[in-house]
């Protein structure tokens, strides 16, 4: 159960970090251009 919850939180955090990173990269690229 702990491993399942840990993997779920890890995947959720990774997806959130990826989404936030893409939005941050888009904002920087738009600001430069």
Curated annotation (Swiss-Prot):
Primary localisation category: virion
Topology term for the membrane: Single-pass membrane protein
Keywords: Host membrane, Membrane, Transmembrane, Transmembrane helix, Virion
Keyword Cell inner membrane: no
Transmembrane segment boundaries: 5-25
Source organism superkingdom: Viruses
GO CC terms in record: host cell membrane; membrane; virion component
Cellular compartment(s): Virion; Host membrane
Role according to the record: May initiate with G7P the virion concomitant assembly-budding process, by interacting with the packaging signal of the viral genome. The assembly-budding takes place at the host inner membrane. In turn, G7P and G9P are present at the end of the filamentous virion that emerges first from the bacterial host.
Family to which the UniProt record says this protein belongs: Belongs to the inovirus G9P protein family.
The protein, known as: Tail virion protein G9P
Organism: Salmonella phage IKe (Bacteriophage IKe)
Gene that specifies this protein: IX
